[in-house]
Amino acid sequence: MTEKQRIVFAGTPEFARITLAELRQGPEAVVGVFTQPDRPAGRGRTLQASPVKQEALAAGIPVFQPESCKTGEALELLRSLAPDLLIVVAYGQILPQAILALPTRGAINVHASLLPAWRGAAPIARAIAAGDKESGVAIMQMEAGLDSGPVLWEERLPIAADDTAASLHDRLARLGGKALRHVLDDLWAERLKPVPQDPALVTYAHKLKKEEALLDWRLPAATLERLVRAFNPSPVAHTLFRDKGLRVWQARVLGAGGDQAPGSISAVEKDGVVVTCGEDRLQLLAVQPAGKGVLSGSDFARGYRPQVGEVLG
């Protein structure tokens, strides 16, 4: 009987958990999981295990959480697992070449963009914010650079006009798990043909910063609507209303109307307030006042009685 191929999986968030769950359905043996150390989360700031750790423990897979993989201890830990392949999905650490080279078949990465577009930490949100019409998953052979290795497999899907980072994330995660199965089957059969990335087409998906989510009403409404979707579920687009924070969870673009300054409420309609932008107007369909739950635009208009001419921001 042929021995099962030994896989070590390195990943941390929900996207990686979905990939790990799909991987576990295959014939390979997942002999260990590397994930980020437990971090404080929530209002109580209690330590919380990553989604990948929770999935691995439930499956009885050994879990390792080094603060850094650039130590000799991390290298020896990986060596002790004798992996045939290392699979990395949104792990959260840059892995040194010594780690990548240790498995007999090297290391591969599942990345949520059509490389070389959107290398880096936030490819899903950046694709939506930029107005891209399609996204996808690329699986690449890892090397020391940031998401720079040759592409082994690519799957595409359209970005819907109402896609948020959350909805696109879930579709890409499922797609990534299925694409990984194709890659593993071809890897063991030695059918893969790596394709180098074109350096001229590289773009970077830098990590999202909370200050980016503050809506600048001088921008076109179409740009702001994309940002609302790109920053949902985190860090969430926001503005100020009567000097208090107001999160914007859903919005839609309306045509120009009136000559109010950007940020001014130009109308209060049944579906929500309409705000003048640098170009066209934005209607706020779902908002969250500071310290409150999410309200529909109509409930917000009824409860807070915003007035035409009031300024947001």
Swiss-Prot record:
The keyword Transferase applies. It is an enzyme of class 2 (transferase). The keyword Nucleotidyltransferase does not apply. Its EC number is 2.1.2.9. Keywords: Protein biosynthesis, Transferase. Belongs to the Fmt family. HAMAP family: Formyl_trans. Attaches a formyl group to the free amino group of methionyl-tRNA(fMet). The formyl group appears to play a dual role in the initiator identity of N-formylmethionyl-tRNA by promoting its recognition by IF2 and preventing the misappropriation of this tRNA by the elongation apparatus. This is Methionyl-tRNA formyltransferase. It comes from Acidithiobacillus ferrooxidans (strain ATCC 23270 / DSM 14882 / CIP 104768 / NCIMB 8455). The lineage of its organism: Bacteria, Pseudomonadati, Pseudomonadota, Acidithiobacillia, Acidithiobacillales. The gene is fmt.
